[in-house]
Amino acid sequence: MIGRIRGVILEKQPPVVLIEAGNGVGYEINMPMTCFYELPDIGQEAIIYTQFIVREDAQLLYGFNQKQERALFRELIKVNGVGPKLALAILSGMSARQFVTAIENESISSLVKLPGVGKKTAERLVVEMKDRFKGLNGDLFEQNGDIELPASASSKAPSAADIEAEASAALIALGYKPQEAAKMISRVATAGADSETLIKEALRAAI
């Protein structure tokens, strides 16, 4: 099982990052956008904690910046009706801290704003996740003591159209319909904003 990858970032196509490990192999890793935002730029080194998921039609890696975020993902996919794709969408719309707070406060109104989460799923999340937090919450937000990596350098921005298309594609991958994703991005589009900023603002506006 692949639990941790350290390597150089080759490509970033939200919510997927391609990272080359020391053996020269490139790993495609699906990441929640709340984790994706924290990645260094292309060409820089990153450490990603991973969860390997095997399906009938695919073998997928999901990645996180902290072990605790991965632990939360593992608990989420144990909830009835919540698969890896929905768990990824949930942790893209809310940070781990925000999600824990929403569950503890039984904030159904916040949870139903997440893509793919209806009222019944939100209620199920509150019921099933509250007990699971007892084993997680104590260290969920502690620093993990990993080696600090060098700060990333600025990269050259693509065209505004490319940025908006990339941001829309990321929202579609998280479960939003194409038309809905395009509208969400157009509402927050500003000159000079990169795709990660547009995605972050679009998800924030949706909550």
UniProtKB/Swiss-Prot annotation:
| Gene Ontology MF terms | ATP binding; four-way junction DNA binding; four-way junction helicase activity
Recorded protein name is Holliday junction branch migration complex subunit RuvA
UniProt-annotated stretches for the region Domain I = 1-65
Please provide the record's free-text comment about the domains of this protein: Has three domains with a flexible linker between the domains II and III and assumes an 'L' shape. Domain III is highly mobile and contacts RuvB.
Q: What is one Pfam family matched by this protein?
A: HHH_5
Quaternary assembly:
Homotetramer. Forms an RuvA(8)-RuvB(12)-Holliday junction (HJ) complex. HJ DNA is sandwiched between 2 RuvA tetramers; dsDNA enters through RuvA and exits via RuvB. An RuvB hexamer assembles on each DNA strand where it exits the tetramer. Each RuvB hexamer is contacted by two RuvA subunits (via domain III) on 2 adjacent RuvB subunits; this complex drives branch migration. In the full resolvosome a probable DNA-RuvA(4)-RuvB(12)-RuvC(2) complex forms which resolves the HJ.
Q: Where is this region: Flexible linker?
A: 144-158
Q: Which organism is it from?
A: Proteus mirabilis (strain HI4320)
